[in-house]
Design a protein with these regions (language model features):
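Sec-dependent bacterial lipoprotein signal peptides
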Residues: 7-29
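Ser/Thr-rich, low-complexity intrinsically disordered terminal regions
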Residues: 31-163
């Protein structure tokens, strides 16, 4: 009986030693991602959302990924400056690109620091801002991207920038 307990302890130790590095490698691999593969802003539009439930877009073809675009209430130039500042103020968000018509931001999750891409494109002629928020890795985001877009919508409405 003592031999079995000793073998059990050895097996548990082996499992702990092997699973730890494996999990670390998995997390690091999951965090590495090429945003260029997932982000396509500019007048050509956005990449469509994948079939996985971790992306929302105002230009999504699949209704389950759709969100309404933002409709500006005021002058596009002035409003766009406020939009840029508001996006930059979101928690754990880093502006990667902010120009006259495009914003690309990287949003990190609180615990595992996974990166999501938040992309906005302004069409000044009609005052429409198309928006896309997508996880770089994983299958489901548990609604994080949709909540991010709706939180941004709420902040911009509070500032009387969008309808």
């Amino acid at each position: 009986m003592a031999l079995l307990k000793s073998d059990d302890k050895k097996m548990k130790k082996i499992l702990k030693v092997s699973i730890g590095p494996l999990m670390l490698i998995t997390i690091l691999y999951g965090c590495s991602g090429n945003s260029a593969e997932r982000h396509n802003s500019g007048s050509s539009g956005f990449l469509d959302c994948p079939d996985t439930p971790n992306c929302v877009s105002s230009l999504a073809k699949n209704p389950k990924h759709q969100v309404e675009p933002f409709r500006l209430k005021k002058d596009p130039k002035t409003s766009w400056d406020v939009v840029q500042k508001t996006v930059g103020s979101l928690p754990r968000t880093k502006l990667v690109l902010a120009d006259n018509s495009d914003i690309h931001a990287e949003c990190r999750s609180l615990i595992f620091r996974f990166v999501d891409d938040l992309t906005l494109h302004l069409t000044p002629a009609n005052g429409i801002i198309n928006i896309r928020s997508a996880s770089r890795t994983g299958y489901s985001d548990l609604g994080v991207n949709r909540r991010r877009v709706e939180n941004l919508r709420k902040k911009l409405r509070h500032k009387d920038i969008i309808e």
